[in-house]
Design a protein with these regions (language model features):
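A structural signal for small-residue-enriched, beta-sheet-centric alpha/beta enzyme cores
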Residues: 1-172
Length: 172
């Protein structure tokens, strides 16, 4: 389950050019919702590529999300509001030669993708986590290395948001 809809396993990737690739895999089962208040548009819609999770966009009549945890009574009835009942487990991968500290930074940045795709994320009822790994391959060099790591982390956040939406879209 993802909120009140069926969860699933999703993946996404992005070619950054020059041999640099980022990818994400997500097992999606959060207590939070992946949909906007209309129940159809994914929170991750701004990051969608080529209609990969339905191509739905918010309409002009979209009601603003004012309720931080909608459908509480239904979530309680389905026993979703219990510690350990939900989680979103994620891994992001990059094809660059990152150090352990840089992988940690990329994982920290990729957490933003989870928060972009699920509302709310990281609740006391979730065990949300993001791991990062590197396949080596592309040498970043030392010139502007922090900038490259920041770009990779940002791209990982975007692909993770897509992977989460794809997991739910393919399951429903």
């Amino acid at each position: 389950m993802a909120g009140l809809v069926k969860g699933g396993l999703g993946s996404a990737s992005l070619d950054l050019g020059g041999g640099l690739m980022v990818g994400a895999l997500a097992a999606v089962n959060p207590v939070g919702s992946v949909h906007m208040p209309d129940g159809e548009t994914f929170w991750a819609w701004p990051f969608e590529i080529d209609g990969e999770f339905g191509g739905r966009r918010p309409g002009a009549d979209l009601v603003l999300a004012r309720e931080p945890l909608p459908e509480q009574s239904r979530l309680k009835a389905e026993r979703r509001l219990e510690p350990g009942a939900n989680t979103t487990l994620c891994v992001v991968a990059v094809s660059a030669d990152l150090t352990s500290a840089e992988c940690k930074r990329v994982a920290m940045m990729a957490q933003d993708g989870l928060a972009r795709a699920v509302r709310p994320a990281h609740t006391p009822f979730d065990g949300d986590v993001v791991f990062a790994l590197t396949g080596g391959g592309v040498a970043l060099g030392q010139d502007e290395r922090p900038l490259h790591v920041a770009q990779l982390g940002s791209a990982c956040a975007d692909v993770l948001a897509r992977a989460i939406a794809r997991g739910v879209y393919s399951a429903t």
